[in-house]
Amino acid sequence: MFIVGLTGGIGSGKSAASQWFEKQGIQVVDADIVAREVVDVGQPALKEIATAFGDWVLQADGSLNRRALREHIFQSPESRHTLEAITHPIIRKSIIEQLNAATSPYVILVSPLLFETNQHELTDRNLLIDASEEIQIARASQRDGQSIQQIQKIIAAQMPRAEKQQRADDIVLNDGHLKHLYQQLIALHENYLNH
């Protein structure tokens, strides 16, 4: 199976790109969705997180208080490493299972931390959806309702844009309209079909 890693910073347009690929009949494995699934109520990772951090990470219904944990880990690199040590191996295992089950001509692995978590090792080619930091902030603040400061912290915690550009095999600049994004994806889709 030919696997294309799709990455980009917050607000870059990863979701728009992955949805476009899905409309072309290409299966998509989304690392963010997998990351949410592995910490659902009843999953072993959730219990490990509560043990490591305390019950304050749980909401009244027993689910993960994502916002509180996110704010905590962006203030504490040590806590972020603890969380990653718990979740990343479980996430990777689930991603591999889903990639192996794919039946489309190729499969997309969407991951905002494709390079940071070494998920690029699972791929044959890597596509960066790129946007300027100003556009990332504008899109993410509109979409998520987060403050500019929170978004800047997320951007700062991710691999620098220039490094992602160096590591990517393909780069799509998404500073404009969706139509422009889709036009760029058409050519890449054809290339991926003919891998």
Swiss-Prot record:
Protein name from the UniProt record: Dephospho-CoA kinase
Q: List the Gene Ontology MF annotations in alphabetical order.
A: ATP binding; dephospho-CoA kinase activity
The GO biological-process annotations, alphabetized, read as: coenzyme A biosynthetic process
> Does the entry annotate any disulfide bonds, and if so which pairs?
none
The species is Acinetobacter baylyi (strain ATCC 33305 / BD413 / ADP1)
Which superkingdom is the protein from? Bacteria
Q: Gene Ontology terms, cellular component aspect?
A: cytoplasm
Protein task: Catalyzes the phosphorylation of the 3'-hydroxyl group of dephosphocoenzyme A to form coenzyme A.
Q: What is its main location?
A: cytoplasm
InterPro entries assigned to the protein according to its UniProt record, in alphabetical order: Depp_CoAkinase, P-loop_NTPase
